[in-house]
Amino acid sequence: LGAPFTDPMADGASIQKAGLRALAHHTTLADTLKLAARFREQDQTTPIIVMGYANPVFRMGYAEFAKAAHEAGVDGTILVDLPPEEDGELREAYAQYDLSVIRLATPTTHENRMKKVAEGASGFLYFVAVTGVTGAGSADPQAIAGNIEMAKRVSGLPVCVGFGVKTGVQAAEMAKIADGVVVGSAFVEHAEKAHESGDFAGAPRGMGALAKELSSAIRTITKP
């Protein structure tokens, strides 16, 4: 569940514009947690991860955010601009509510750095498949297969791959080497098209169809 931010430096055009639309309607981090709580009322089992940037969480206060996130039914966060060296206070707050601190690794993360990334991480490791922003380019599974294997070995955590995955075919290829696949921009683009055309009912239809495509493709994969 994406939390909008004014300076989303890791995101491509689609998610940047989505964030601007949300901010134009005065959407706050507290509103994002309210949305999580509404979802949790209907679904008590699907994990909820809030993804965004550190500044809004810092402004709310790590302890206050951790408490509010827990009460909303959130299971963890991905704060893409908060490095391991600076998240000690956050981890302390999260530990009180068993919230996961999900960290990121990239194709340029070497093994010694991976050990630091893995230290204190929980939930899963988010592996950025391309050097760039969200929605940019296409990921090459063969190019990162060795990185994924190393990340699993060093971290002891499940590794999910994101950035550059938009179709069922791409998701299936990534599922062969990873424990999960993260797709964001492709879903947001359905919302953008609906916003531009005024066909607001089209957004959930398009997102639902994409979710089925991705899920069906991944379920055909047999791990070696």
Where are these predicted regions, by residue range?
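Surface-exposed amphipathic alpha-helices with a cationic face
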Residues: 36-41, 70, 91-95, 145-155, ...
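Non-catalytic positions within long, well-ordered alpha-helices that form the structural scaffold/packing
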Residues: 70-71, 118, 152, 175
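Expand to "…catalyze enediolate/carbanion chemistry for C-C bond making/breaking, isomerization
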Residues: 129, 153, 166-168, 172-174, ...
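Catalytic cores of alpha/beta
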Residues: 109-119, 161, 165-181
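Short beta-strand/loop segments at the ligand-binding rim of alpha/beta enzyme cores
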Residues: 43-53, 94-105, 152-163
